[in-house]
A protein has these predicted regions:
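Short, small-residue-biased leader/transition segments that mark boundaries at the very start
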Residues: 2-9
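Conserved SAM-binding loop and adjacent beta-strand
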Residues: 14-33
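Conserved SAM/SAH cofactor-binding pocket of Class I
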Residues: 30-112, 122
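A generic alpha-to-beta junction signature in SAM-dependent methyltransferases
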Residues: 36, 129-135
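Conserved beta-strand segments of alpha/beta enzyme cores
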Residues: 66, 91-93, 140, 161-164
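A short, conserved alpha-helix within the catalytic core of class I
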Residues: 118-127
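Conserved beta-strand signature within the Rossmann-like core of class I S-adenosyl-L-methionine
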Residues: 133-148
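Active-site capping/gating segments
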Residues: 148-185
């Protein structure tokens, strides 16, 4: 057992089988591609990337887009790095830090999946988003969330566009899953 495998075991142990990984993680991540057609050289930060979702599937789908995956837990990043290296994914970089600590870089978009309340995600994202847009969508935060989001959205003070993942992928798992998009103002 290698060091990377040792790191990966606790992260992947909750995933029951390949179908679950594909449906619950890969497809869910790729739902972002249904609403955003990122142009080449777009720079995206994945906040709290965990085991690499949504960043890794999106990096495969958009090979000319630069993805910077950030997490405060180093073990998770080791798994992401091993996956990227093993799959030959060249458009991913990683950083072991909290997003609030990033001061010297700007991105076109921030993405996340099940990381923190929208209010926090927006507070962390807004300072690191570029002002100039290179895509059809205005630069901003795109996050994947589930459940009843009305209170969370209200408390965030933002006015996100909210799209149902179920309308993209007609699977029961996605009935209460949503994509939230907050434009940089």
């Amino acid at each position: 057992v290698t060091g990377v495998q040792t790191c990966a075991l606790p992260i992947l142990s909750a995933l029951k089988d390949i179908d679950e990984i594909y449906l619950h993680h890969v497809l869910h991540s790729l739902s972002i591609a249904a609403i955003a057609n990122f142009k080449p050289k777009t720079e995206i930060i994945d906040i709290g990337c965990g085991g690499g979702f949504p960043g890794v599937p999106l990096a495969i789908f958009f090979p000319d887009v630069k993805f910077h995956l950030v997490d405060s837990i180093g073990k998770k990043l080791k798994v992401v790095e091993a996956i990227a290296e093993g799959a030959g994914i060249k458009n991913i970089t990683t950083q072991h830090t909290r997003v609030e600590e990033i001061k010297n870089r700007k991105f076109d978009f921030a993405i996340s999946r099940a990381v923190a309340p929208l209010k926090e995600l927006w507070r962390w994202s807004k300072p690191i988003l570029k002002k100039d847009n290179n895509n059809e969508m205005v630069n901003g935060l795109i996050c994947l969330k589930g459940g009843d989001l009305h209170q969370e959205i209200f408390e965030s003070g933002t006015r996100p566009k909210m799209m149902s993942v179920y309308e993209i992928f007609n699977e029961d798992y996605f009935k209460e899953k949503f994509i939230l998009y907050v434009k940089r103002s």
